[in-house]
Amino acid sequence: MGIAHTEWESVIGLEVHVELNTESKLFSPARNHFGDEPNTNISPVCTGMPGSLPVLNKDAVRKAVLFGCAVEGDVALFSRFDRKSYFYPDSPRNFQITQYEHPIVRGGCIRAVVEGEEKTFELAQTHLEDDAGMLKHFGDFAGVDYNRAGVPLIEIVSKPCMFSAEDAVAYANALVSILGYIGISDCNMEEGSIRFDVNISVRPRGSRELRNKVEIKNMNSFTFMAQALEAEKRRQIEEYLSHPNEDPKKVVPAATYRWDPEKKKTVLMRLKERAEDYMYFVEPDLPVLQITETYIDEVRQTLPELPHSKYMRYITDFDIAEDLAMILVGDRHTAHFFETATMSCKNYRALSNWITVEFAGRCKAKGKTLPFTGILPEWVAQLVNFIDRGVITGKIAKEIADRMVSSFGESPEDILRRHPSLLPMTDDHALRAIVKEVVAQNTASVADYKNGKAKALGFLVGQIMKRTEGKAPPKRVNELLLAAMRDM
């Protein structure tokens, strides 16, 4: 990016549509379930049949209130539904029921760590609305599946408070974590149960103005989100630099774009509609939604410990690295796995590394995540304890981890019992002979160590471990090696 580009900054906000995991739809008794045969989970309300009337799903309201409490938002005692009018084949009523003027939650915040810095991102509002159906294309014709029509959504709208792609991705990750912890959505991007629309504008660095924003629709991966934001930032800056004397509103008009991952560029879909184009008006078939402070307090009491609080506790109580703590708390199942393991192992730093690095990598290669493999937390704790007590070496521990992931049903103790060849070298006489031989064959490295070059010791240890196939106890190797060099 050229010098001229560095004099500009992004201003980013996100609109996130989250499908709530209720049993039925927002305004009808039809089943809310992904993957069923087309048009099997429908009712007259879903398909806009004349005379059908909406009835609000109580569980969807509770889940929206729970989210509002989780993000410390202001849950409204009175909220209202509105009709958003537009014509599209996947919307059989020709309108969506949403909350335009009086949302169920205002404000709130999402806390995230961005490149080591803790940031707080403010929310504008969260509102309830129903989803549209899906168009499915089959060569020379298209079909409409109304199974998704009427599925309950919360739309979470942030303020324009992010200034980089890194901010946006960190915010999105933190939001997904919160939704997972409170259990109101499965957040499956591939199935569309969470969809990210990003709004971005650019301005000269140091300016406070908000220029026309461009919306990039339906980001279905965090990688694409980051790429799209960077590409759109460059596009807008280049437009402004190419037309310095023109009205900024005409240079970059408000519009909706999509991301083309193959061309690595944003592609125009349409110019932005105005609010009046949707002809919002109060939904006549639904009363005002009224809830009480007592109800809100009861819902708030069901909140679990949330990711940010858990993150701070892990750093303080367990003294583990911030980056590993972030990985652990990112998923509630992984966090639970770690905390269960800490009941059997007090080497928290090593434990966090084995869970987030060693086992996570091995499980990913198998297409699984550690908490859902059958490997018990106590087994990972046992593996770390074996290393700490000198029962096995680090190299042997990795071999055992390989076998644990291959079988998903054996503890380290079971594996050692079945494969005694994995046990470390216990013949001290043989180990002394190997140490003596390595020292004799590497006199230059011995001299380097005696002259203050600490790396030489690591080289000598490596030679010994190589000859013992990693089975020599590291502590004993160091003792014998230092003694042998003193005797020279």
Curated annotation (Swiss-Prot):
Instruction: Give the EC class as a word.
Output: ligase
Report any Pfam family annotated for this entry.
GatB_N
Q: Where are the transmembrane segments?
A: none
For this protein, the record's PROSITE patterns field holds: GATB
Say which domain of life the source belongs to: Bacteria
Q: Name one GO biological process term.
A: translation
Catalysis: reaction(s): L-glutamyl-tRNA(Gln) + L-glutamine + ATP + H2O = L-glutaminyl-tRNA(Gln) + L-glutamate + ADP + phosphate + H(+); L-aspartyl-tRNA(Asn) + L-glutamine + ATP + H2O = L-asparaginyl-tRNA(Asn) + L-glutamate + ADP + phosphate + 2 H(+)
Keywords, alphabetical: ATP-binding, Ligase, Nucleotide-binding, Protein biosynthesis
Q: EC number(s) in its UniProt entry?
A: 6.3.5.-
GO MF terms listed in the record are: asparaginyl-tRNA synthase (glutamine-hydrolyzing) activity; ATP binding; glutaminyl-tRNA synthase (glutamine-hydrolyzing) activity
Function summary: Allows the formation of correctly charged Asn-tRNA(Asn) or Gln-tRNA(Gln) through the transamidation of misacylated Asp-tRNA(Asn) or Glu-tRNA(Gln) in organisms which lack either or both of asparaginyl-tRNA or glutaminyl-tRNA synthetases. The reaction takes place in the presence of glutamine and ATP through an activated phospho-Asp-tRNA(Asn) or phospho-Glu-tRNA(Gln).
Q: How does it assemble?
A: Heterotrimer of A, B and C subunits.
Give the record's family classification: Belongs to the GatB/GatE family. GatB subfamily.
Q: What is this protein called?
A: Aspartyl/glutamyl-tRNA(Asn/Gln) amidotransferase subunit B
Q: What is the lineage of its organism?
A: Bacteria, Pseudomonadati, Chlamydiota, Chlamydiia, Chlamydiales
Q: Which gene encodes it?
A: gatB
